[in-house]
């Protein structure tokens, strides 16, 4: 009957478990739901239920992700767990399940492993704001010093990727022992509560979409006789009021200023439009042919047009509907960035990488044929001949 107590008044956060295969991410997810179920804050979700992750589609890519939800005294969480390493990469690059924070799981028996590094690097590239560490399987290590060494190693890794390695909370426990325990006072279960306290207090509450600077990708343009030009789209973030000054950004380096003289939704006039709304904005003094799909309407000074950037791109496998063959420098696909569809060229690959194979994820430098409104952490799709061949996230803007 725990369901009755669920309240929606608490702040909501999206969290995920990351780390190397078999280090205990899924076991920990199950243990968290079991520990919080004792307090009436969750429904216990067993390991098998989490491990059978349903398929989801994001930007044309199939990803296996499990979502569980639970609460603490302070917050409501949606927790994501992916069964396979490739699913993590695809999820983080497509942003299918956005993370406000992550729990990095590292087995005391192994320490930092290749996928541990890769997940931390990805978390940095896609701007996961904060991380809490759970050193798992400490029941299987006799030597306390070994656990200390693993902690040092993890802190160094986090610092290397620009997370505050010295400040990050590190909790040591055993997900399996906590899962097998049968009372909330068990010391292993207490470690799970300690972990959730760290998540509650260390992972910052995300800025609400409505508090961010206004941005709306332009999908369509209409001309209304006697009134002017209306652009439509879904507001990505922020709020727009009638009378606000905005910029039209993208498709050239010239940024045009105008004023929104009307906002309408479902043919009704509004005083304001907020993040998530599909609206039409009437623009003062802008001709129908002076604005195009692929540009964005944005708060002045909040976003700029760019042509060249670095991105982490996941290249779809043949089985996922992607390419059958590798590609090299000079490859020219289409980049779908918000509503813009622009040809771009792969101008640089990492040192030692000659070609990119289907199934790889690689940091590459892209140069578009014309500038688009771009920012770090932004997602996009790579398409060729009408099919998605990759998904990417902008990791650095060059020019």
Swiss-Prot record:
Amino-acid positions noted as binding Mg(2+) in the UniProt annotation, renumbered to this chain: 26
Annotated region (G5) at: 174-176
- UniProt region (G3), positions on chain: 81-84
Report residues binding GTP: 19-26, 81-85, 136-139
Q: What is its EC number?
A: 3.6.5.3
Q: Where's the tr-type G domain?
A: 10-207
One MF term in GO for this entry?
GTP binding
The record's section on CDD domains has: EF_Tu, EFTU_II, EFTU_III
Instruction: Kindly name one Pfam family recorded for this protein.
Output: GTP_EFTU_D2
Q: Where is the segment annotated G4?
A: 136-139
Q: Where is this region: G2?
A: 60-64
Please give the residue ranges the record annotates as the region G1. 19-26
- From the UniProt record, list the reaction(s) this protein catalyses: GTP + H2O = GDP + phosphate + H(+)
Q: What does this protein do?
A: GTP hydrolase that promotes the GTP-dependent binding of aminoacyl-tRNA to the A-site of ribosomes during protein biosynthesis.
List the HAMAP family hit by this protein, alphabetically: EF_Tu_B
| Complex formation | Monomer.
Family designation: Belongs to the TRAFAC class translation factor GTPase superfamily. Classic translation factor GTPase family. EF-Tu/EF-1A subfamily.
Alphabetized NCBIfam families for the sequence: EF-Tu, PRK00049.1, PRK12735.1, PRK12736.1, small_GTP
What is this protein's record name? Elongation factor Tu
Q: Which organism is it from?
A: Kosmotoga olearia (strain ATCC BAA-1733 / DSM 21960 / TBF 19.5.1)
